[in-house]
């Protein structure tokens, strides 16, 4: 009521009425803007205005007991007035200074753990080196880059579950931590954050930084890994760049880099196998990168690279809808086309069957070192605007665009026959044939393309057939631009299908990727890549094949031993012995195999001649298709270290050396593992092989007479029991089986039962 009276009183004064009625308030919008809503419209002004007041800050009442009323200089730190509209007190900025200097100390042990990403950034900058500044035109192109170094690769949803579990473990709500990485991180963080006093909200924010990849679409001219992006503002301007070497690596960049190398190796290897798709999947599932399963990384990591995308497609994951040709990523920005098969004649009168794209289309082409805009019609290049780091990169882009245009003058520029093959010795498809041909030598292509006069357009320049720049003339339709072409920004992913030969198609049937598009660049991975698949043993050369083959036999000796005695053919056909065949001289492979198989058969027939070391040593040679011959060998040759080296059939050699005392096997001086049983005992390791058809009943039973040797067992009648002396001088009681059908399981249980009987 008081307020209303006051207002009436004001209005009765003529001056008030005059001000309010005569002042033009023609901008209702402005008044609305500054008076409606809770959002501060001019924060910096508001801040300055507030800070000019004596007590601009409010604090909890308890602060008055923790802070003196005045500081050492006698300035008042808080007001006795309480804040209007809340039960807080008004505090001076000087109170903050006092608190920072004299307030209570808490433990700082958790800070480096919570603010890990910041602490690590400081370290990287401390140890980084900044070089000279160069002034030059920067060709920047927008790319999707990772702006957050040092993160794991969880999806937003996975991270949310981890954060809730770590920060608010007792909150209600369904949280299912399924992936390996989720569980590991949760356990680690819970331990780190015991008794942590930092506000849960802050902890949650910082955890999010650590767990989730954040990407932005930024103009970049140079390194795109996250340790370069974090200093982008220091390393490149509009007309300058500063050289910089990061002072440390981060795992997320290492994962991206190692993933690309692993994927390329796997796709290249799968392409030459009998069933590329099955092989690729087998390898992806059995490979680890830096201790994490490759398939888990593929599910989480958004890296777009040809080989990585082929692996993702094989796993049924969505990938980007752009397609790849000649190492460039093409994205159609407008137009459409239909495809039609057409036969064309090369300059050498060779017939090629190509799929012609009919219709007008525009594309962006983005490569590692060059980018372009391409406009084309049916078998005709209308315009190509290229920008790139150097002449070489620009030429690469021009060749790819000319081939992609399918123009007749390009096809007529072919000299000689086209017979390029892929790694599996299959002919490449015609478009890749043309591409390879001109990548080798584009002289004729550029000469025959044709030249035109050009207008002077800002930022554009012509390019002549010898790749020199010109302002007067240019190859037809071609211009070089100072400006780069941005990468396709959308992160949209589409469902794709993949065929047996690793060709990836979108739902309309357009080929997006194929093994031909996978880069041949070799690099050294930053994280250890462990390929468990035998297909990848070759990647490190012949020695690695040799060591891996023998390691595999030793690791799986229990099963190998049983198969050796019961189903040798199945054993010889195992894919793990495939890589080994490339080490054996082709001319003699068959004879070696026949010889070893005969030797093994004799071992099976003559009881007690079983020799573990010898079986392991010779087994890989038996895998080749055998040739029957009377030839005997005392040593077998393998091609390693650039020459033939010998493996002795009986005894040790530098290639295969078994130390009886330590039971360790060394292959070419490298440790290949330990044999669990002693191969010297004529019968050791033969237990499960020889006690086929006998049931082990238990420990020795004197009622059944003295212990027989294994060789004497064969005289027992079905159902008869006897004590038998096995391997290391132990005696067990056995009974000869009445039926033969259960023989297979015998050898599998024999070893276990013998152990039990002895112990």
Curated annotation (Swiss-Prot):
Q: What is the protein's major site of localization?
A: virion
Site (Mammalian adaptation) found at 627
Q: Does the keyword DNA repair apply?
A: no
Q: Which GO terms describe its cellular component?
A: host cell mitochondrion; host cell nucleus; virion component
Q: Does the keyword Transcription apply?
A: no
Any one GO MF annotation of this record: RNA-directed RNA polymerase activity
Sequence motif Nuclear localization signal, location on chain: 736-739
Q: Which InterPro entries match?
A: Flu_PB2_2nd, Flu_PB2_6th, Flu_PB2_C, Flu_PB2_CAP-bd, Flu_PB2_middle, Flu_PB2_N, INV_PB2, PB2_helical
Keyword list, A-Z = Cap snatching, Eukaryotic host gene expression shutoff by virus, Eukaryotic host transcription shutoff by virus, Host gene expression shutoff by virus, Host mitochondrion, Host nucleus, Host-virus interaction, Inhibition of host innate immune response by virus, Inhibition of host MAVS by virus, Inhibition of host RLR pathway by virus, Inhibition of host RNA polymerase II by virus, mRNA capping, mRNA processing, Viral immunoevasion, Viral transcription, Virion
Q: Where in the cell is it found?
A: Virion; Host nucleus; Host mitochondrion
Q: Which GO terms describe its biological process?
A: 7-methylguanosine mRNA capping; cap snatching; DNA-templated transcription; symbiont-mediated suppression of host cytoplasmic pattern recognition receptor signaling pathway via inhibition of MAVS activity; symbiont-mediated suppression of host gene expression; symbiont-mediated suppression of host mRNA transcription via inhibition of RNA polymerase II activity; viral RNA genome replication
Quaternary state and interactors: Influenza RNA polymerase is composed of three subunits: PB1, PB2 and PA. Interacts (via N-terminus) with PB1 (via C-terminus). Interacts with nucleoprotein NP (via N-terminus). Interacts (via N-terminus) with host MAVS (via N-terminus); this interaction inhibits host innate immune response.
Write down the HAMAP family for this protein, in alphabetical order: INV_PB2
By sequence similarity, the record places it as follows:
Belongs to the influenza viruses PB2 family.
* Cited function: Plays an essential role in transcription initiation and cap-stealing mechanism, in which cellular capped pre-mRNAs are used to generate primers for viral transcription. Recognizes and binds the 7-methylguanosine-containing cap of the target pre-RNA which is subsequently cleaved after 10-13 nucleotides by the viral protein PA. Plays a role in the initiation of the viral genome replication and modulates the activity of the ribonucleoprotein (RNP) complex.
Protein name in UniProt = Polymerase basic protein 2
Which organism was this protein described from? Influenza A virus (strain A/Leningrad/134/17/1957 H2N2)
Per the UniProt record, the lineage of the source organism begins with: Viruses, Riboviria, Orthornavirae, Negarnaviricota, Polyploviricotina
